[in-house]
From Swiss-Prot:
Subcellular compartments: Cytoplasm
Phylogenetic placement of the source organism: Bacteria, Pseudomonadati, Pseudomonadota, Gammaproteobacteria, Enterobacterales
Record has Zinc as a keyword: no
Signal peptide: none
Name of the gene: rlmH
EC number of this enzyme: 2.1.1.177
UniProt name for this protein: Ribosomal RNA large subunit methyltransferase H
Enzymatic reactions: pseudouridine(1915) in 23S rRNA + S-adenosyl-L-methionine = N(3)-methylpseudouridine(1915) in 23S rRNA + S-adenosyl-L-homocysteine + H(+)
Length: 155
């Protein structure tokens, strides 16, 4: 199974790239994890936000292809680390690759939400999207460590 983080936004601060890459390199070869960045639409004071969201959503869904789609969204289901490890095991048994979608400043398009098989909430707080990339990578790595009895996670 391959994990894919599909996120709106490019040009992240160095600390985001450093943190994300640190966890990316830790993933085992049998569970590769990749980042696909979708360029954010231009948002000016007269921008058509619905059109921008729709375009970003089309690009995200095209990148995900036939993968299982999991959106990251505040109203999603909050999983603690053991629950995420259980979900990771279920995803592996499903046999498909998994695309986790992170929207732009206004969130995800209705099409992305409709295509999602699951929606995961990292927090009831609104988190900066660059930080979410690092949190997701670390959380998935920690979940993997639980499923393989790797010493990274300690109870």
């Amino acid at each position: 199974m391959k994990l894919q983080l599909v996120a709106v936004g490019t040009k992240m601060p160095d600390w985001v790239q450093t943190g994300f890459t640190e966890y990316l390199r830790r993933f085992p070869k049998d569970m590769p994890f990749e980042l696909i960045e979708i360029p954010a639409g231009k948002r000016g004071k007269n921008a058509d936000i619905k059109r921008i969201l729709d375009k970003e959503g089309e690009q995200m869904l095209a990148a995900a292809g036939k993968n299982r789609i999991v959106t990251l969204d505040i109203p999603g289901k909050p999983w603690d680390t053991p629950q995420l490890a259980t979900e990771l095991e279920r995803w592996k048994l499903d046999g498909r690759d998994v695309s986790l979608l992170i929207g732009g400043p206004e969130g995800l398009s209705p099409a992305c939400k409709a295509a999602a098989e699951q929606s995961w909430s990292l927090s009831a707080l609104t988190l900066p999207h660059p930080l979410v990339r690092v949190l997701v990578a670390e959380s998935l790595y920690r979940a993997w460590s639980i499923t393989t009895n790797h010493p990274y996670h300690r109870e």
